[in-house]
């Protein structure tokens, strides 16, 4: 995979509003459906990316660990002509296989990804209950082939700080 730098949203930015189809149940999901008292985690993922595949187990664990404290949504913005394994049908299969209890949305036009300035997968955006961006970045410092097991340490630290009313400090990313 080529190294892709992402400009990402600035911290303190309000969550872009969107409506997309949930690949699992074909219903439209809107940001207005989020619980107003709960922080939100928006995850840009896809089915074929080796980095996302590397994180499957940890993503499942993390979302289960925080399901009572966060709202989750995953979005795939890939071109299914070039990546047929990222089609809504395949997204549904993966969501069922991994036990996703949250919406897995298909961004066919890539407009939502552009509004988040998401350039690669996976990318994580953690918003407070007022939909203000508190963290954007990686899950942890593991990657396919580097010998480090996924732990979610960077994202978990950000979530814990947010849930405990502490400042989320990006300088504390684990290298």
Q: Which residue stretches match the model-derived regions?
A:
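Chalcogenol-based redox active-site neighborhoods
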Residues: 1-170
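Conserved small/polar residues in nucleotide/adenosyl-binding loops
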Residues: 173-175
């Amino acid at each position: 995979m080529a190294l892709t730098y992402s400009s990402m949203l600035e911290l303190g930015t309000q969550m872009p509003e969107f409506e997309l189809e949930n690949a699992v149940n074909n219903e439209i999901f809107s940001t207005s459906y989020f619980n107003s008292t709960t922080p939100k985690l928006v995850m840009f993922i896809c089915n074929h990316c080796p980095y996302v595949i590397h994180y499957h187990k940890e993503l499942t664990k993390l979302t289960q660990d925080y399901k009572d404290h966060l709202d989750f949504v995953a979005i795939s913005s890939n071109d299914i002509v070039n990546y047929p394994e990222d089609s809504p049908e395949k997204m549904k299969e993966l969501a069922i296989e991994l036990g996703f209890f949250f919406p897995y949305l298909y961004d066919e036009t890539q407009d939502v990804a552009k509004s988040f300035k998401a350039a690669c997968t996976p990318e994580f955006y953690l918003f407070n209950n007022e939909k203000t961006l508190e963290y954007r970045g990686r899950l942890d410092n593991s990657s396919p082939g580097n010998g480090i097991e996924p732990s979610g340490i960077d994202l978990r630290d950000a979530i814990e700080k947010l849930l405990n009313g502490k400042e989320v400090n990006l300088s504390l990313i684990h290298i």
